[in-house]
Curated annotation (Swiss-Prot):
Its EC number is 2.1.2.5, 6.3.3.2. InterPro entries: Formiminotransferase_C (IPR013802), Formiminotransferase_C_sf (IPR037070), Formiminotransferase_cat (IPR004227), Formiminotransferase_N (IPR012886), Formiminotransferase_N_sf (IPR037064), FormiminoTrfase_cat_dom_sf (IPR022384), FTCD (IPR051623). Keywords: Cytoplasm, Folate-binding, Histidine metabolism, Ligase, Transferase. The active site is at 81 (for formimidoyltransferase activity). This is Glutamate formimidoyltransferase. PANTHER family: FORMIMINOTRANSFERASE-CYCLODEAMINASE (PTHR12234:SF8). One of its GO terms (cellular component) is cytoplasm. The keyword Disulfide bond does not apply. Catalyzes the transfer of the formyl group from N-formylglutamate to tetrahydrofolate (THF) to yield 5-formyltetrahydrofolate (5-CHO-THF) and glutamate (Glu). The triglutamate form of 5-CHO-THF (5-CHO-THF-Glu3) can also be used as substrate. It can also catalyze the transfer of the formimino group from N-formiminoglutamate to tetrahydrofolate (THF) to yield 5-formiminotetrahydrofolate (5-NH=CH-THF) and glutamate (Glu). It can replace YgfA to catalyze the irreversible ATP-dependent transformation of 5-CHO-THF to form 5,10-methenyltetrahydrofolate (5,10-CH=THF). One of its GO terms (biological process) is L-histidine catabolic process to glutamate and formamide. Folate binds at residues 164-172. Signal peptide: none annotated. It comes from Thermoplasma acidophilum (strain ATCC 25905 / DSM 1728 / JCM 9062 / NBRC 15155 / AMRC-C165). It is found in: Cytoplasm.
């Protein structure tokens, strides 16, 4: 079996019944295991993580996109997070011995099917991009260019989709790709000042001279009256969680602001948390071999 992970992001984070319908559509496909469902009402966005055999990955992702297109009206959607469509971003991630080339093929096969069968415009990104200017997700969709702007811009040659029509319906557009594992990590600050948040987000993101492998945005969380620094850590081995957190803390201190909590959206590799423990506890020579549960699993597998 060739395993892949898929982490589709859907533009619904407030209605659990709707999210469950999308989840169930994905889970109905053979070999699919749903690992996690995260809902965020401030962003009005959900992230569903599933794994399956690569031969079933396109069917499973397509089922989720189709369900989302049927129940989410982007004209009525409001949320803090940038978005293009009901099924907004759908990345495939290689697991175990699966090659990135496999995920690229899956992304392109899915994009073609979504464009042809559902009539939804599709943009390929990351490793699956067919145009160099679309390899970076933020170059396609960002806080200043979302669903509303795409409705007009899609008529231009620059915004011609890789698959599907050059017309945006109520399901919006989908961005489909293949990438390595990333960690979605957010830090909430004890301020409601978005200008401070924007300065911190700019200071830590790679493209503005911050940390390599970090993408960041600032959001205002209305229900908490806090600013959130939302990050994607695209290589946690080279830029670990603790380093991103410490730079946020350092930059925030300039303005008399402190982090009050942080969160991981979706799943995280065990090694990423081991790295955090080693840093803050100054552990020497610590690895997964020191974790009781790992030893127990190994012993059980030897029986």
């Amino acid at each position: 079996m060739s395993l892949v992970e898929c982490v589709p992001n859907f533009s619904e984070g407030r209605d659990r019944d709707r999210v469950n319908r999308i989840r169930d559509a994905i889970a109905s496909v053979d070999t699919v295991k749903i690992l996690d469902v995260e809902m965020d009402p401030n962003h009005n966005r959900s992230v569903i993580t599933f794994v399956c055999d690569s031969s079933k990955a396109v069917d499973a992702a397509f089922a989720g996109i189709k369900a989302a297109a049927e129940i989410i009206d982007m004209d009525a959607h409001r949320g803090e997070h940038p978005r293009f469509g009901a099924a907004d971003v759908i990345p495939f991630v290689p697991l175990q011995d699966t090659k990135m080339e496999t995920c690229v093929r899956l992304a392109r096969d899915l994009g073609k099917r979504v464009g042809e069968e559902l009539g939804i415009p599709v943009y390929l990104y990351a490793e699956a991009a067919q145009r160099p200017d679309r390899s970076d997700l933020a170059a396609i969709r960002n806080k200043n260019f979302q669903y509303e702007q795409l409705k007009e811009a899609i008529k231009e040659e620059k915004w011609k989709p890789d698959f599907g029509p050059s017309v945006v319906g109520k399901a919006g557009a989908s961005i489909i790709g293949a990438r390595d594992f990333l960690i979605a990590y957010n830090v909430n600050l004890n301020t409601s000042n978005m200008e401070i948040g924007k300065k911190i987000a700019s200071a830590i993101r790679a493209k503005d001279g911050g940390l390599t492998f970090v993408k960041s945005l600032a959001f205002f969380l209305k229900d908490k009256n806090m600013v959130q620094i939302s990050m994607n850590l695209t290589n946690y081995r080279k830029t670990p969680i603790y380093r991103a957190y410490e730079l946020v803390r350092l930059e925030a201190a300039r303005y008399g602001v402190l982090p009050v909590e942080s969160e991981i959206v979706g799943l995280v590799p065990e090694q990423a948390l081991i790295d955090v423990a080693k840093y803050y506890l100054q552990l020497n020579g610590f690895d997964e071999g020191n974790i009781l549960e790992r030893k127990m699993e190994k012993a059980a597998n030897m029986e």
